[in-house]
Amino acid sequence: LMAQATTTMRLRTCVTNPATREPTVTASALAVLDELSGGRMDLGIGRGDSARRVLGKPPTSMKDLEQAVHVIRALVEGRGIEFEGTMLELPWTSGHQLPVWIAGYGPVALKLTGRIADGAMLQIGDPDLIRWFVSQVRDSAAAAGRDPNHVQVMAAAPAHVGDLADGRDRTRWFPALVGNHVVDLVNKYPREDLPEELTAYVRDREGYDYLHHAEVGSSNASFVTDEVVDRFCLV
């Protein structure tokens, strides 16, 4: 509907993952939407958090994420590629270039973004943290011989206009959601590899119920202070 009802705006998945949606299926769907929109389709992809954890499974590996990006990009752009031992191609595609946006916070994800992606998707509104993320992406792009300024950045955070206290309560779920990614990073990386402003607020987190994922008023957000809401959201 959006592809056929618009003429200039770009369209993007926000975000898919290679675990719950097989890469060739994603590629086929994107190729169709790219054709319908006249070449305005982008891929937004990550490791998969709630989509996997609600099934009791971990997000996909960075290796599988990178492979999925290469497979989806090649197929949508009309190029053949080997995947799981088979040469694949979608000969009917329009052949338009597929911009790829990777969602992630950790050093490895940010380096991957700088190395192979067209854009970084950051679920956060804190300007200082965004600067840190952007520096990681651009340093990686430069190390890969790419122009760092060609890698775009999108900061995705909820916004609320109205009463301040009400706005904080209605957006408090968002830092709690982000906290799931942050806990993964804390468990994976040395403390000095991550900004203190990103990791400190999850230390009092007791757990997360995925049956109430991204839910306004959920007890998942009980550990999130007003100060954290103000940093992560636009209220």
Feature names for model-found ranges:
Residues 26-29, 104-112, 170, 235:
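Short, acidic/polar
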Residues 58-90, 130-235:
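An alpha-helical appendage that flanks or caps ligand/catalytic pockets
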